[in-house]
Amino acid sequence: VYVDLINALQVEPAEPASELTWDIALMRTDLQINGGISGPGDAALHDMLGGDWSDTISVPTDAEWHTDEPDALAFVTYPPAENTGDGACGGINGDFGWYYYSGFCDDGEGVHHISPRDVIYVVRDRSGSYWRLRMLAYYDDAGSSAHPSFEFAPLQ
């Protein structure tokens, strides 16, 4: 799913890697940004772990910008992991950018569960406008996986 933040629309680019019609793309847990290796845009993100949604009204002056790299999508890499593999959970649980994966442990939501981390992203879109964005869920109301939901709003 490709999203145009400016027009708040889902778009269907014929060739996403070379088009400027989208800002972010979602596929299961992978989120791409139209910048770096994922697209020709100048989109980038800054992460604020534990940031407050209502207090995030402008771009931080100390923002560190990240784009997608060959082996690291920005949304899945930033912020860096605080929780990493626990042997009791098969060593595969932990933080992965925007989400926490429970692996073989039941952290209250069940095994193999994906939960959004408490992260506010500041996103620079392909046209240079700025947005705040946060992931809300990975599951739909029926509990089916791979239905990520998020909210976003323009910044000053």
Give each language-model segment a name.
Residues 1-156:
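Surface-exposed, beta-sheet-biased, low-hydrophobicity segments with strongly acidic/polar composition
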